[in-house]
């Protein structure tokens, strides 16, 4: 994984997109109704970041700034990458 010079850990969320690991609050599966509402609310409020490159959304990442990031990578995979970054 790549690191910034300030030693903040980054998580690869697919297609060359990264999220600062310390800002992540939750990594969730997008299939439930509450997660669909969360995504729609974030879109309407301008807090949605779509990192899917036009592919199917497979995970939703919620940050401490209340931004919602859509990823085409499975939630389990993103979670494993997050855990690996915590271990380093």
From Swiss-Prot:
Which family, according to the similarity comment?
Belongs to the RemA family.
Name assigned to this protein: Putative regulatory protein DvMF_1139
- Species assigned in the record: Nitratidesulfovibrio vulgaris (strain DSM 19637 / Miyazaki F) (Desulfovibrio vulgaris)
